[in-house]
Amino acid sequence: MTDIIATEVAPEAAEALAPVVRAPLGDRPIQTVGRRKEAIVRVRIVPGTGKITCNGRDLEAYFPSKVHQQLIKDPLVTTEKAEEFDVIANLRGGGTTGQAGALRLAIARALIASEPDDRPALKKAGFLTRDARAKESKKYGLKKARKAPQYSKR
């Protein structure tokens, strides 16, 4: 019986340890996650016509506010890929503003996964920064996080 010595590495095994280079996007969907406040968004982008779907509804139906629609489309407009990808988003938790911010972050991350050369433009515009602000917790003895009960001198 022959023992295999761990220090010996065959040339084929050395090649197997080389870093993996991903194939071009093709028809493979890219999945990313974005978070803001209490909102969590999972996004899949696939090559398409530029349609954005949120929880099975159209973007305009899910986010009636033009401000939120503009906020969400900004990464696609900045990279000039608004007509190249279809975005399918699963949104959970939070309110409309939190969900819109989380969706923008997820789309920006997905665009980088598809085309790493877009990173400097998205970074400069601030689309890759996770907004870490969250609601401050309420303290005992206070009415809210910082609001004290009314003070009566007498």
Swiss-Prot record:
It comes from Salinispora tropica (strain ATCC BAA-916 / DSM 44818 / JCM 13857 / NBRC 105044 / CNB-440). The gene is rpsI. Belongs to the universal ribosomal protein uS9 family. This is Small ribosomal subunit protein uS9. HAMAP family: Ribosomal_uS9_B (MF_00532_B). PROSITE patterns: RIBOSOMAL_S9. GO terms for biological process: translation. GO terms for cellular component: cytoplasm; small ribosomal subunit. The lineage of its organism: Bacteria, Bacillati, Actinomycetota, Actinomycetes, Micromonosporales. Pfam families: Ribosomal_S9. Residues 140-154 have a biased composition (Basic residues). Keywords: Ribonucleoprotein, Ribosomal protein. One of its GO terms (molecular function) is structural constituent of ribosome. Residues 133-154 are annotated as: Disordered. The keyword Ribonucleoprotein applies.
